[in-house]
């Protein structure tokens, strides 16, 4: 997946929505309301998948040793982060490494800076994995990039002053890792490598715009201009202007039968805006397949059958996730 698309998804999760950059003419209300739907969808989907830690079944000393090693390595925490990454970006990336005591450990890498290259044939076997990141000097100033390339036998380290230079340089170091296979593993969210937020991102943006505009309209209504017609308003005997009289006395005296006053404001569209808000909210949950758990239909008196029906979409979504997560765990 393209890096700009992944960055857009990351921004949505971190509430850096496009609405925050919207500009309006000076003097006009310009509220920016960003809603955390992306974070909600990702966290609910990930927790539903691995909220209860993955269990490994087996008998014998080998199985017990494996479970102890996983516990010491905090694998359940890594699994949760990988599930969150997969729900957001469409894939999570795990690296297996040896710590200072030569014990195997694992960590989740940023999918924006790590990936696996596969064979271009029916086997689609992993050929190597890449993890790149900027490097800084002692003063903290960026001075180039470093890339670690993981093959089935060793870890190669490349450094260059520019990102493009990584493609042309020679490895600065080569260290065997002894895992016997590529120790970089991708956890796909589905066969399309698509996240749960992408399909509803435009709906979330529209929801942000709608709610921001509703607050803007409400503020403009409070500050609406008062139009007075058919009457001549003058300074009173205390030297107050018509505007000062209205502000202080809260009263308009219009003796002429043809005179009148009214506020200049948009026609009321509150009902239409609320209907649109509810439609957007419904579509966000419908197409992400993550239900609104604060919905009154999830009240405590709901029947088991009704609850199962409400969670049907999330159950189906989780089955797909589980299939691909299980396959990555076997690596």
Labelled PLM ranges:
Residues 1-109:
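Extended, helix-rich architectural segments
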Residues 6-9, 37-46, 66-70, 130, ...:
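Generic structural signal of hydrophobic/aromatic residues within well-ordered alpha-helices
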Residues 58, 70-75, 195, 199, ...:
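Catalytic cores of large soluble enzymes that bind and process phosphate-bearing ligands
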Residues 63-65, 260-262, 309-311:
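A short, surface-exposed helix-loop junction/capping segment
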Residues 67, 281-285, 326, 330:
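Generic solvent-exposed, charged/amphipathic alpha-helical segments
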Residues 87, 93-193:
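Extended, regular secondary-structure scaffolds
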Residues 168-306:
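Extended, charged amphipathic alpha-helical segments
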Residues 312-331:
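Extended amphipathic alpha-helical segments with heptad-repeat/coiled-coil character used for oligomerization
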């Amino acid at each position: 997946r393209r890096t700009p698309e992944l960055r857009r998804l990351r921004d949505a999760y971190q509430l850096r929505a496009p609405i925050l950059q919207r500009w309006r003419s000076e003097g006009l209300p310009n509220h920016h309301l960003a809603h955390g739907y992306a974070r909600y969808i990702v966290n609910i989907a990930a927790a539903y998948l691995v909220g209860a830690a993955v269990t490994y079944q087996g008998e014998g000393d080998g199985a017990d040793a494996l479970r102890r090693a996983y516990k010491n390595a905090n694998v359940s925490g890594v699994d949760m982060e990988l599930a969150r990454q997969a729900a957001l970006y469409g894939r999570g990336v795990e690296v297996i490494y040896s710590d200072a005591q030569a014990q195997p450990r694992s960590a989740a890498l940023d999918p924006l800076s790590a990936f696996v290259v596969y064979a271009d044939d029916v086997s689609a076997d992993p050929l190597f994995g890449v993890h790149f990141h900027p490097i800084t000097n002692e003063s903290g100033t960026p001075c180039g990039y470093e890339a670690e390339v993981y093959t089935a036998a060793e870890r190669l380290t490349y450094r260059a002053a520019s990102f493009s230079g990584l493609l042309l340089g020679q490895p600065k170091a080569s260290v065997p890792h002894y895992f016997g296979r590529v120790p970089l593993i991708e956890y796909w969210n589905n066969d399309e490598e698509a996240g749960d937020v992408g399909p509803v991102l435009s709906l979330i943006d529209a929801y942000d715009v709608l709610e921001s505009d509703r607050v803007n309209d409400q503020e403009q209504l409070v500050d609406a201009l008062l139009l007075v017609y058919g009457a001549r308003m003058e300074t009173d005997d205390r030297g107050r202007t018509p505007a000062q009289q209205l502000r202080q006395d809260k009263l308009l005296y219009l003796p002429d039968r043809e005179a009148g006053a009214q506020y200049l404001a948009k026609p009321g569209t509150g009902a239409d805006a609320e209907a649109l808000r509810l439609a957007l909210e419904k579509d966000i949950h419908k197409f992400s397949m993550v239900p609104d758990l604060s919905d009154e239909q999830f009240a405590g008196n709901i029947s088991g059958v009704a609850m199962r029906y409400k969670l049907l979409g999330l159950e189906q979504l989780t089955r797909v996730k589980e299939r691909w997560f299980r396959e990555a765990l076997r690596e």
